[in-house]
């Protein structure tokens, strides 16, 4: 997958309020849930949206504000999901960037978009490797 890069650099942590993070998460996931491609995928997997939002708010608050409230392994818990596609990752990123572009905080937009790009690339690469490795491994030839 080739995701268009963003500009280098970033403003660092502590650049937004907790209310900004809450608004980002709630607005973004409302878009995700309404999206024709992503909505059905997420709706089939997320049972408790309030709990999921709380977790995501802690995650993004840790990244954007340095709160260190999030404790978890986001990539590992998503790797087992069947059916993810490159188009889904690209759509997720496009919706995220649309949301951050409307947040009114340029420093937050840059930091959040950079983090989302890194995560999307890392997650997609790990997901592909896991998909290739499912099943019996091919042994190396003897000798």
Residue locations for each model-derived region?
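Core of compact, soluble alpha-helical bundle domains
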Residues: 1-143
């Amino acid at each position: 997958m080739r995701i268009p890069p963003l500009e280098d650099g970033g403003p660092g942590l502590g650049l937004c309020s907790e209310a900004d993070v809450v608004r980002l998460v709630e607005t973004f996931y409302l878009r995700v849930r309404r999206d024709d491609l992503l909505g059905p995928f997420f709706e089939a997997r997320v049972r408790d949206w309030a709990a999921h939002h709380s977790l995501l708010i802690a995650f993004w608050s840790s990244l954007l504000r340095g709160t260190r409230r999030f404790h978890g392994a986001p990539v590992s818990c998503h790797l087992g999901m069947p059916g993810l596609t490159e188009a889904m990752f690209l759509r997720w990123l496009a919706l995220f960037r649309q949301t951050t572009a409307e947040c009114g905080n340029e420093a937050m937009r840059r930091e959040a978009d950079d983090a989302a790009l890194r995560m999307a690339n890392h997650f997609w690469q790990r997901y592909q490797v896991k998909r290739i490795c499912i099943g019996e491994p091919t042994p190396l030839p003897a000798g």
